[in-house]
């Protein structure tokens, strides 16, 4: 069975992974993954469909019980997960969704503050079905950060949103992470999204990390910056995308 994530001691890395493997029946999904993520670092994970991205995130979150696996996996005790589907409980109000597990006046105050941070002040008593898709993801972000996690895991959180809403959510996530300073692992198919947000970008291919790229661009990122374009070309090549006049790596 897959090992449960261990708890990190204070002043260590937010994520420590060594030789991580995961298998489903006879198929190897993760094959000897090594990774460290520093406290407060924003890391994006790219890869083609079936490369093992979501399996890796679920392993970090401790959500892969019953899956065969080996390796060392250490994460902080306080972590939150955001998925593409906001996964709000339809029978609870917005603030009730945000404050699940929190009690008393302090919990309500923390919930109101979290909703204000994501631009939803005054929507505390709304029902999830009264919100747009983008607003539902804002609630999911508020819920994930209300407990000040040391690690935020995000699995394609904006994949179902339209292009304009995605850009707005990029700005919001950047602001929230700068304020709360969790370590972040963002799983995405969107190369530009990864470059726009991350300090480092990883590429996973057939269960192995084949790229670990530091993004040394000022924020907010300018898509017209020639260096942005160069990072895009390099990453697309590692993802097997052939560009005119170039061969994929």
From Swiss-Prot:
Its EC number is 7.6.2.14. It is an enzyme of class 7 (translocase). Keywords: ATP-binding, Cell inner membrane, Cell membrane, Membrane, Nucleotide-binding, Plasmid, Translocase, Transport. GO terms for cellular component: plasma membrane. It is found in: Cell inner membrane. Its main location: membrane. Pfam families: ABC_tran. GO terms for molecular function: ATP binding; ATP hydrolysis activity; hydrolase activity, hydrolyzing O-glycosyl compounds. It comes from the Bacteria. It catalyses: ATP + H2O + aliphatic sulfonate-[sulfonate-binding protein]Side 1 = ADP + phosphate + aliphatic sulfonateSide 2 + [sulfonate-binding protein]Side 1. PROSITE patterns: ABC_TRANSPORTER_1 (PS00211), ABC_TRANSPORTER_2 (PS50893), SSUB (PS51291). Signal peptide: none annotated. Residues 15-231 form the ABC transporter domain. ATP binds at residues 47-54. It is a peripheral membrane protein. One of its GO terms (biological process) is carbohydrate metabolic process. The complex is composed of two ATP-binding proteins (SsuB), two transmembrane proteins (SsuC) and a solute-binding protein (SsuA). Belongs to the ABC transporter superfamily. Aliphatic sulfonates importer (TC 3.A.1.17.2) family. This is Aliphatic sulfonates import ATP-binding protein SsuB 2. It comes from Rhizobium johnstonii (strain DSM 114642 / LMG 32736 / 3841) (Rhizobium leguminosarum bv. viciae).
